[in-house]
A protein has these predicted regions:
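Short, well-ordered beta-strand elements
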Residues: 2-12, 32-35, 97-102
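Beta->alpha turn/N-cap motifs
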Residues: 14-15, 38-39, 50-62, 74, ...
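Ligand-binding cleft/hinge of the Venus flytrap
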Residues: 18-30, 108-127, 208-212
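A bilobed periplasmic-binding-protein/Venus flytrap-type ligand-binding module shared by bacterial periplasmic
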Residues: 22, 84-93, 98, 175-190
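Short helix-initiation/N-cap motifs at beta->coil->alpha
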Residues: 33-44, 121-139
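A conserved helix-loop-strand patch within extracytoplasmic ligand-binding domains
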Residues: 74-131, 160-162, 166-168
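Secondary-structure end/capping motifs
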Residues: 187-251, 255
Length: 267
């Protein structure tokens, strides 16, 4: 009897492209049904068992770490300026009273709270990622993903913070945006795990092809997107990334963003 395909969720931003390309081409042969969605939606779908494994925001892994195991060696990370996790404000940090946060984001909202000392009565509300509408009734906005590439010719009164760059400035550590989490009751064979790890390596060697086939950012020069994938995004959950992820876990616990501190556990 044929085993059902494991439902594998992956987000549809450019930074997932090097992982997504090999998975879409070869995933079915390895027992995966690949599904795309936003990072926040993937986290919710994995939690509700609508997915068996998914690339989810790192903060969402820590919220439910007892229910998940991670695929080793694979993540989406950055070390310094990344350009796709942007906090834009019309006021000084200590004067901000409300923030419109990209409704596709989870980890970036947590990161924002960790990096800045906001007023205790700060309001953060989720909005579709449209800067103009977000700033109508709010002092600041958080925008992630491909939409951030399109933010040009901003009003000079708007101050822009790259949250990955700010994290590195404050901590000196890699920031892990997303991890590959598998529900505890799901069996992933060694060949399937190795396939995911090899997909990362293969995809990183096909960046030009990823960019050429990507339709989400018309008008942005290919060399800009290639530089982003090759120089600003990292895909190895290596020692430095695990150190940064652990530090993020500790800070989230200290600030009450997560209720319990968990050790990182792998398959």
């Amino acid at each position: 009897m044929t085993q059902p395909l494991l439902r594998f969720g992956i987000h549809n931003f450019l930074n997932a492209g090097p992982l997504l390309l090999p998975l879409e081409e070869q995933g079915a042969n390895m027992g995966f049904q690949v599904m795309t969605d936003s990072p926040a939606a993937l986290a919710d779908r994995l939690k509700s068992s609508d997915l068996d494994l998914a690339i989810i925001p790192s903060v969402e892994y820590f919220k439910l770490a007892e229910s998940y195991r991670l695929v080793s060696d694979v993540c989406i990370a950055s070390r310094g300026e990344v350009g796709t996790v942007l906090f834009l404000t019309k006021k000084p940090i200590n004067k901000i009273s409300s923030i419109a946060a990209d409704n596709r984001s989870r980890t970036s909202v947590a990161l924002l709270k960790l990096l800045f000392s906001f007023n205790s009565d700060l309001s953060i509300r989720s909005f579709p990622p449209d800067l103009e509408s977000m700033l109508v009734d709010h002092s600041a906005a958080l925008i992630i993903g491909d939409v951030a590439f399109k933010l040009s010719e901003l009003d000079p009164s708007i101050t822009v913070y790259d949250l990955s760059e700010e994290w590195f400035r404050q901590t000196g550590k890699t920031f892990v945006h997303a991890v590959v989490a598998v529900r505890k009751n799901i069996f992933l064979s060694q060949s399937q795990k190795k396939f995911i790890q090899q997909a990362k390596i293969e995809g990183c060697g096909r960046v030009k092809e990823v960019v050429r086939g990507y339709r989400g950012l018309p008008g942005i020069e290919a060399k800009v997107l290639e530089n982003y994938l090759e120089k600003k995004i990292g895909y190895d959950l290596n020692e430095a990334a695990i150190d940064g992820l652990t530090h993020f876990n500790n800070l989230c616990y200290q600030q009450g963003i997560i209720s319990k501190k968990h050790a990182i556990k792998f398959l």
